[in-house]
Amino acid sequence: MKKIFLTFVKANAEANKVIAGILEKLSNDDREKDRKSYFKSLSGLFRHNTGCTAYFLSLYKAAVPDNAEAQKALAPLAKMEELKGKLTEEQWKKAVSFSKIVDKALVDFINALNDTDFEAPVTIDWYKGKPPTVPLWFMLEQFIAHNTHHRGQISQILDSLKIDNDYSGISVKLL
């Protein structure tokens, strides 16, 4: 199970890196322009993925409190800050830096897990408390689906702008 999740989170990190590279080539105005998506701009979608990854990791952290290596992997997240609204160029650079920190923390966290950790109960605060917890492996699947979904939104917007991309799927580079 660990090998599978490592493949997915490494692919996630690679896709985020490539997307950040594409978005960095846009003007700040183009990156921040309201594109009529739920999170408005390309920057907003990118930051939503980063922020949700940090949020999911906070849930995962609470599920494995006795795994010191997993806890250590998430320590860099303490440096994170939420960047809201339209960003300046300098803030965008910070958002990209945060994305790299979050993606590395996620890979390191998965590397630190043992087989029983994947069954650890993760407390969730949605679905009206039913169920109150789900296994960590399930939440990891939800994370992967979530990030792929939003990368797909970014990809669709980039397509409409005639910017070459294909980063909503899995890369075979990791095989």
Residue locations for each model-derived region?
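A generic structural signal for well-ordered alpha-helical segments enriched in polar/charged residues
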Residues: 14, 18-21, 25, 101-108, ...
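Residue-level preference for long, well-ordered alpha-helices that form the structural scaffold
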Residues: 1, 5-8, 91, 95
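Short, contiguous alpha-helical
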Residues: 6-20, 28-82, 126-175
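Acidic/histidine-rich alpha-helical segments that form the ligand environment
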Residues: 80-124, 132-153
